[in-house]
């Protein structure tokens, strides 16, 4: 069972201690289509829960990636900047967008687990 938590905007976060890894869901990458550009935040940037933290562009649309929790960015994934198509191949794995140190770990509890997210996706069909 995945320890990922999801937002209604289709971001995911996986938390290890006080560090979270953030990306977009497989549903989101599928909806976007072929990803052609990614912008990730710089380390040291402070982001608030729900605030724009990254950008993903596809042949169909440009979309913001929002931070699911508040914290300080510790790393951006240069691999997806160099090869945006990785987002389509491994959205919920190697194609994470950024890592951050959580400033309020309690915010994670407000997010959906995999089962709740799957149920939410069914309401969008």
Curated annotation (Swiss-Prot):
GO cellular component, one term: cytoplasm
UniProt keyword list: Lipoyl
Coiled coil: none
CC cofactor note: Binds 1 lipoyl cofactor covalently.
List of residues that carry N6-lipoyllysine: 60
Key word Transmembrane helix present: no
PROSITE patterns: BIOTINYL_LIPOYL, LIPOYL
Matching InterPro entries: 2-oxoA_DH_lipoyl-BS, Biotin_lipoyl, GCV_H, GCV_H/Fam206, GCV_H_sub, Single_hybrid_motif
Cofactor(s) listed: (R)-lipoate
Top-level taxon in the UniProt lineage: Bacteria
Residue ranges occupied by any Lipoyl-binding domain in the UniProt entry: 19-101
An annotated GO BP: glycine decarboxylation via glycine cleavage system
Family: Belongs to the GcvH family.
NCBIfam families in UniProt: gcvH, PRK01202.1
Protein task: The glycine cleavage system catalyzes the degradation of glycine. The H protein shuttles the methylamine group of glycine from the P protein to the T protein.
Entries under HAMAP family matching the protein: GcvH (MF_00272)
Record PANTHER family: GLYCINE CLEAVAGE SYSTEM H PROTEIN (PTHR11715), GLYCINE CLEAVAGE SYSTEM H PROTEIN-RELATED (PTHR11715:SF3)
Quaternary data: The glycine cleavage system is composed of four proteins: P, T, L and H.
Protein name: Glycine cleavage system H protein
Species, as recorded: Paramagnetospirillum magneticum (strain ATCC 700264 / AMB-1)
